[in-house]
């Protein structure tokens, strides 16, 4: 008859035997996983076909999930070594992108469907200036009449009533026509005189040194008339402003001697 100590040892060995066998079997299964550290370090290719096993243990479930990921088309070795949750994230991202693209397409279609109709802009009417209905036609002067009027204007810019009546009858024109022509000619002479004075002033300022100015305003009518040989307004100056004589004279010296 065996002693109690031997029975305990046999009992303990019987209990430890199945437990040790289960641990060794678990280690073998864990080491055979394709995403374990040993498999990654050894660079061994995972088996293409895995034997079917019962879905009882967690290790078998992980192995089956990994085999499903490997058998899916479009997934390479990166998906084979990735955890099972990565596939779910990939499907979620793809579904979100498809929903966003569908929403954008529908929004574009709705925007094109409800676009406002094009507006037809009518061209703005250009309003032309209308002349008076009772406006008299422009008098066509002949060449001989224009030459006579120009000679008379050079002699005298303002005509008296008697002179205008006599001059208009000699040209076969009315007094009103002669009067209007003289008014227009005086306005033209004034514009020409102002342009000549402006050119003269610009030329004088260009020749003067910095900080020096003319002792009188060149645009005043009295001083401007002194620059001309006669009182005729549209004559060119007999002597333009000489730079040497102007520099030699003092500032307060006038230029009446130039004429």
From Swiss-Prot:
Under Gene Ontology molecular function, one entry of this record is:
DNA-binding transcription factor activity, RNA polymerase II-specific
* Comp. bias intervals (Basic and acidic residues): 1-11
| Keyword Transmembrane helix recorded | no
Q: Which GO terms describe its biological process?
A: embryonic morphogenesis; ossification
Query: What is the first-listed, main subcellular location in coarse terms?
Result: nucleus
Can the keyword DNA-binding be found in this entry's annotation? yes
Q: Where is the composition biased (Polar residues)?
A: 90-108
Q: Which CDD domains match?
A: homeodomain
Which key words tag this protein in UniProt? Developmental protein, DNA-binding, Homeobox, Nucleus, Osteogenesis, Transcription, Transcription regulation
Residue ranges, annotated region (Disordered): 1-29, 47-124
Subcellular location per UniProt equals: Nucleus
Q: Which residues bind DNA?
A: 134-193
**Taxonomy, superkingdom:** Eukaryota
GO CC terms on record? Answer: nucleus
Family listed:
Belongs to the Msh homeobox family.
Task: Write down what this protein is called.
Answer: Homeobox protein MSX-2
Question: What organism is this sequence from?
Answer: Coturnix japonica
Q: Which gene encodes it?
A: MSX2
């Amino acid at each position: 008859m065996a002693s109690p100590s031997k029975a305990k040892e046999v009992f303990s060995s019987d209990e430890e035997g199945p437990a040790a066998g289960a641990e060794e079997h678990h280690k073998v299964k864990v080491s055979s996983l394709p995403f374990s550290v040993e498999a990654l370090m050894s660079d061994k290719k995972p088996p293409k076909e895995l034997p079917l096993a019962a879905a009882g243990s967690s290790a078998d479930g992980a192995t089956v999930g990994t085999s499903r990921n490997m058998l899916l088309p479009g997934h390479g070795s990166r998906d084979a070594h990735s955890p099972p949750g990565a596939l779910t994230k990939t499907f979620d991202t793809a579904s979100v992108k498809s929903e966003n693209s569908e929403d954008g397409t529908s929004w574009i279609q709705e925007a094109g469907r409800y676009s406002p109709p094009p507006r037809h802009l009518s061209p703005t009417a250009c309003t032309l200036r209308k002349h008076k209905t009772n406006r008299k036609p422009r008098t066509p002067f002949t060449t001989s009449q224009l030459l006579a009027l120009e000679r008379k204007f050079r002699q005298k810019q303002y005509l008296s009533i008697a002179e205008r009546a006599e001059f208009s009858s000699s040209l076969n024109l009315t007094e009103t026509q002669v009067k209007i022509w003289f008014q227009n000619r005086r306005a033209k002479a004034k514009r020409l005189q102002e342009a000549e004075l402006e050119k003269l002033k610009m030329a004088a300022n260009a020749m003067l040194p910095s900080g020096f100015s003319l002792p009188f305003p060149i645009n005043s009518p009295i001083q401007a008339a002194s620059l001309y040989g006669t009182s005729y307004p549209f004559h060119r100056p007999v002597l333009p402003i000489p730079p040497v004589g102007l520099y030699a004279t003092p500032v307060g010296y006038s230029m009446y001697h130039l004429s």
